[in-house]
Amino acid sequence: MYSHVMLGVNDMEASKQFYDATLGALGYEPGVMDKKGRCFYRTPKGVFALSVPLDGKPATGANGGTIGFLAKTTEIADAWHQAGLENGGTTCEDPPGPRGDVMYLAYLRDPAGNKICVLHKL
């Protein structure tokens, strides 16, 4: 359904460090910067990208919005969460763990305040 997701960030260096670490914990390669100062994480199934807002205003997290990534195991989900905390992220929602008997979730806010999570289907 999606070709790409692009998040607004305020500090590209801090955000790239955060996403290189968290997406690296999920098995993805570090992001690649383009000539316009945007950062791209490309996969065969889609693109995740970071950009400083073009209008010059501060990037803000979407109120009520969350971007979710898949984790192959609960251990990978926990490693993702820890990598985020160690690289400028903050925890949000409940601690990482099962939600009912169907999924395992972990939530973070990135350095720009965007809410992201990983989901592992149990």
Question: What feature does the model see in each segment?
Answer:
Residues 7-48:
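Core segments of cupin and vicinal oxygen chelate
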Residues 41-85:
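Long, continuous compositionally biased terminal/linker segments
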Residues 1, 60-64, 100:
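Short glycine-enriched loop/turn motifs at secondary-structure junctions
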Residues 6, 51, 68-70, 94-95, ...:
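A cross-family glycoside hydrolase active-site/sugar-binding cleft signature
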Residues 1-16, 67, 122:
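N-terminal beta-strand motif that seeds the catalytic metal site of vicinal oxygen chelate
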